[in-house]
Amino acid sequence: MSLFGFLQRKPTAQVARNRLQILLAHERGLEGNADLAAILQEEIIAVIAKHVEIDREKVQVKLDRGSAFSTLEIDVEMPNGKKA
């Protein structure tokens, strides 16, 4: 293990993708949890707000459950150049 490898951060997109995959896999085992989309929306807003100033009303999370797979759709209106 090198010192330089320890100090490097993982790419944010990859970390977020891994978290969503884990969350969706877990969610598939918890059928009937209607509040999952609301919980996801609040957590996603919190993560984005750390880096960019956003309007919470302009973030939409849609979770569609199908028989074979579920889809998670996230719409975020990003401001022009405003940082948190």
Swiss-Prot record:
<protein>
    <recommendedName>
        <fullName>Cell division topological specificity factor</fullName>
    </recommendedName>
</protein>
<dbReference type="GO" id="GO:0051301">
    <property type="term" value="P:cell division"/>
</dbReference>
<comment type="similarity">
    <text>Belongs to the MinE family.</text>
</comment>
<keyword id="KW-0131">Cell cycle</keyword>
<keyword id="KW-0132">Cell division</keyword>
<dbReference type="GO" id="GO:0032955">
    <property type="term" value="P:regulation of division septum assembly"/>
</dbReference>
<comment type="function">
    <text>Prevents the cell division inhibition by proteins MinC and MinD at internal division sites while permitting inhibition at polar sites. This ensures cell division at the proper site by restricting the formation of a division septum at the midpoint of the long axis of the cell.</text>
</comment>
<dbReference type="InterPro" id="IPR036707">
    <property type="entry name" value="MinE_sf"/>
</dbReference>
<dbReference type="Pfam" id="PF03776">
    <property type="entry name" value="MinE"/>
</dbReference>
<dbReference type="InterPro" id="IPR005527">
    <property type="entry name" value="MinE"/>
</dbReference>
